[in-house]
Amino acid sequence: MAIKGIDHWVIVVRDVAHTLEFYRRLGLAIAWEHRPGRPDMPTIRIGDGQKINVHAIDWPDRPGYLGARRPSIGGADFCLEWTGTVPEVLHLLERSGVTPEVGPSTRTCARGPSTSVYFRDPDDNLVELTVYPEP
């Protein structure tokens, strides 16, 4: 037995609706998971088997909350793989009103060398979109 991969991670935000709209404009699917006996969970779906759960900063005050002991806004830094080209990444960001912070620049990601563009989401989390070279 071994760890297989990442199922999900959490970002902590000020305004759930605003954050979900931001990621929707970037082409990600938004879903609300209905959990019996617990509040619904907003999620940002990534492909078939990964997601980002979205927690509001005040959720630790809710009964039954299970999450970070000291959640913080803007504390996330993550990389998402883009299936298109770097110019397409730049066009998507421009069309979405997002200003790149760094890039395009060469980086080493999980599968090796890639080209990345970095930007901030509405809560100041650092988001990296990376493009691997064609084989």
Sequence positions of predicted segments:
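Conserved catalytic-core motifs of GNAT/GCN5-like acyltransferases
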Residues: 29-36, 103-108, 131-135
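Core segments of cupin and vicinal oxygen chelate
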Residues: 11-60
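A short, acidic/glycine-rich surface segment
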Residues: 39, 60-66, 102-103, 109-112
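Vicinal oxygen chelate
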Residues: 13-18, 73-126
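N-terminal beta-strand motif that seeds the catalytic metal site of vicinal oxygen chelate
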Residues: 1-18, 26, 76-78, 133-135
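Short glycine-/small-residue motifs
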Residues: 51, 126-129
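Short secondary-structure boundary/capping segments
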Residues: 1, 43-44, 68-70, 108-109
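Residues that flank catalytic or metal-binding motifs in active/ligand-binding sites
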Residues: 5, 40, 48-50, 74-76, ...
